[in-house]
């Protein structure tokens, strides 16, 4: 039996919003989706008039929808932003080379300037070569570290005021779970921030899609007939994030609001003053922002160039260090008991 659109526009509902459960027609869904992102931008004061903003473009659904909606809202609400596309070529054959064609299509569709930077030109390595040397166990560590710095380098070259990334609500909830499972309190609170960076030496990053569900982003792209690249990275199946994603999907079946619940929990976390927080400074080698000396990118790159790819990998988690400490204390007590019994 046909259902009327809950927005009472007079049309029949054609879809059900995963986020709210509301039955809506396509036009009302588009309006609600765009209005929520506009509210996020305005309420969080993500941009200021006259700013130049780089949209981190991968060709995937998130960055494509982000570019489309930012262009739309910029014109509709007169944000006064100068939007450009910034894409990173990691050098993954059969994945990034194909997705970059989609990015170029986005450039033409949205009439935005596009800058592409590659790992090859920045670091002298491609991910294909890195994986050939290190295997697939830690490839996402290398790629993630290099990609984050590559975006900073590209943003600096373009002279932008901020970088808009396509991180959605699912991504942020997954990251909260990952940091909890790793015992990473330093990153636990920061991962839910809608705006990061922004010191004198770093370009801020903003997440306009922070409260947008992945399912709704897919629906929006589908019904808007946006061109995007949907193939998963060939190295992604080995990523730790995949386990957090699968766990989150299972939880969502039982509790549909779990994504927003986890994000809210992450936002409300407060740590004791005794919890050590990383201090961000400038890497003495590459001059980019880092919380260690030298920065993680420089350490990993040095390992690759010296033929020691695991040089910057292998740091034990806090849980591992706690277990090691307990085992050490237990061994000391056992040794003390042996000495005591000998006398």
From Swiss-Prot:
Query: EC number(s) of the enzyme?
Result: 2.7.7.-
Top EC class per UniProt? transferase
Q: Classify the source by domain of life.
A: Eukaryota
Spell out the subcellular localization from the entry.
Cytoplasm
Question: Which Pfam families does the entry link to?
Answer: ATP_bind_3 (PF01171), zn-ribbon_14 (PF16503)
**One GO CC term, this protein:** cytosolic tRNA wobble base thiouridylase complex
Query: Can you provide one Gene Ontology molecular function annotated for this UniProt record?
Result: tRNA binding
Matches recorded under Gene3D superfamilies? HUPs
Q: Which UniProt keywords apply?
A: Cytoplasm, RNA-binding, Transferase, tRNA processing, tRNA-binding
Q: Does the keyword Transferase apply?
A: yes
PROSITE patterns listed in its UniProt record:
UPF0021
* InterPro entries attached to this UniProt entry: CTU1-like_ATP-bd (IPR056369), CTU1_C (IPR032442), Ncs6/Tuc1/Ctu1 (IPR000541), Rossmann-like_a/b/a_fold (IPR014729), TilS/TtcA_N (IPR011063), tRNA_thiolation_TtcA_Ctu1 (IPR035107), UPF0021_CS (IPR020554)
CDD domains tied to this protein: CTU1-like
- Job description of the protein: Plays a central role in 2-thiolation of mcm(5)S(2)U at tRNA wobble positions of tRNA(Lys), tRNA(Glu) and tRNA(Gln). Directly binds tRNAs and probably acts by catalyzing adenylation of tRNAs, an intermediate required for 2-thiolation. It is unclear whether it acts as a sulfurtransferase that transfers sulfur from thiocarboxylated URM1 onto the uridine of tRNAs at wobble position.
| HAMAP family associated with the record | CTU1 (MF_03053)
Q: Which NCBIfam families match?
A: TIGR00269 family protein (TIGR00269)
The record's section on PANTHER family has: ATPASES OF THE PP SUPERFAMILY-RELATED (PTHR11807), CYTOPLASMIC TRNA 2-THIOLATION PROTEIN 1 (PTHR11807:SF12)
- Protein name stated in the entry: Cytoplasmic tRNA 2-thiolation protein 1
| Source species | Drosophila virilis (Fruit fly)
Q: What is the lineage of its organism?
A: Eukaryota, Metazoa, Ecdysozoa, Arthropoda, Hexapoda
């Amino acid at each position: 039996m046909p259902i009327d659109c809950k927005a009472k526009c007079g049309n029949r509902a054609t879809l059900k919003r995963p986020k709210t459960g509301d039955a809506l027609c396509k036009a009302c869904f588009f309006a609600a989706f765009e209005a929520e992102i506009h509210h996020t931008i305005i309420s969080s004061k993500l941009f200021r008039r006259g700013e130049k903003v780089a949209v981190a473009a991968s060709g995937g659904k998130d960055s494509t929808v982000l570019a489309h909606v930012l262009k739309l809202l910029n014109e509709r609400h007169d944000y006064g932003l100068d939007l450009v596309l910034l894409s990173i070529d990691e050098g993954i054959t059969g994945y990034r080379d194909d997705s970059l064609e989609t990015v170029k299509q986005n450039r033409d569709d949205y009439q935005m300037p596009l800058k592409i930077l590659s790992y090859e030109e920045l670091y002298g390595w491609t991910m294909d070569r890195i994986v050939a040397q290190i295997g697939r166990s830690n490839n996402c560590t290398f790629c993630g570290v290099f990609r984050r710095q590559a975006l900073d380098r590209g943003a600096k070259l373009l002279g932008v005021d901020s970088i808009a990334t396509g991180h959605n609500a699912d991504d942020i909830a997954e990251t909260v779970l990952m940091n909890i499972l790793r015992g990473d309190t330093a990153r636990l609170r920061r991962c839910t921030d809608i705006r990061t960076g922004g010191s004198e030496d770093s370009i801020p990053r903003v997440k306009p899609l922070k409260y947008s569900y992945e399912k709704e982003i897919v629906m929006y792209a589908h019904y808007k007939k946006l061109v995007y690249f949907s193939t998963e990275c060939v190295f992604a199946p080995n990523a730790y994030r995949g386990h957090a994603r699968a766990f989150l999907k299972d939880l969502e079946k039982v509790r549909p609001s779990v994504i927003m619940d986890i994000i809210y929990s992450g936002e409300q976390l407060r740590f004791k003053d005794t919890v050590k927080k990383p201090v961000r400074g400038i890497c003495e080698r590459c001059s980019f922002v880092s919380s260690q000396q030298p920065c993680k990118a420089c350490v990993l790159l040095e390992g690759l160039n010296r033929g020691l790819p695991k040089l910057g990998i292998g740091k034990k988690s806090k849980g591992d260090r706690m277990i090691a400490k307990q085992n050490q204390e237990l061994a000391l007590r056992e040794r003390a008991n042996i000495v005591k019994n000998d006398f």
